[in-house]
Amino acid sequence: MDKKELNTKKRGGDYHLTSKGGLMAFYKNQLTKFYKIGLGNKTEFGVTVDEPLINDYLNKRNTISKEGEQRWYRTDNKGDWVPSVTTVLGVVSKGIYFDKWLANHLDYDHACAARDKAAARGTLVHEIAEQLMEGKEVNVENYGNEIVKRVMCFDTWWHDVKPEEIIASEVMLSHPEIRFAGRFDFIVKIEGKNVLVDIKTGMHYKTHDIQASMYKILWDKICDDLGLGEEYKIHSLAGLYLKDGWIKGPNPQYKALKWCPDVVDSAVTMWRYI
């Protein structure tokens, strides 16, 4: 085992991280039990969309179709099919660091397997984070370190930032006048401002700016249609990067993402051309 590889052991009724270097206990007072993490209850953190008009809109059923790696949406089984945000972003290069990662895999099948593993990991971390925001206590004892340590990063960020309110989470957005659709992670109120936060369990890519901007375009358009003011619109964008490489304690990376509507237009145009 690598010296930096962490295993889990139960000791004295509490769960800790251990390694060859000896016992390492992190945040004993912060977590009720190391592998049982809870952020609070629904009332305390406001896990609702208070505005009835938004609730009615968001409760509409969306039809989803998937062809290969592409995902398509339409609202209420009506109208044209539109691509998902991530499908559109498939035409945009993630940059040199992604290209280097791809080059490290021997062939296409290995690259796809690594991608699928990362996607499954990300989906699980997202699901756990959503349960925590709903006020549930989540037991992650049986998950591997790559999941547990990312969840601990989320827990640490939440308690450090202390969002005043959860405006919406895991919402599927579509609009008949916009030629893409998608599901964002959550919008929270931080220091009086509505922040769309996108959870990432991998590296930072410039495409994350475009992705968050696409969600903002959809959300703000819905607010305009419903006659809602700035109180409900998104004021800023952020990426929350949850990694498992830390040793001395959870180290979530919270980064501002750039609002880039012009780049969104270019990406959509390129996707439609291709």
Identify the residue ranges that each predicted region occupies.
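Metal-dependent nuclease catalytic cores that hydrolyze phosphodiester bonds in DNA/RNA
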Residues: M1-A181
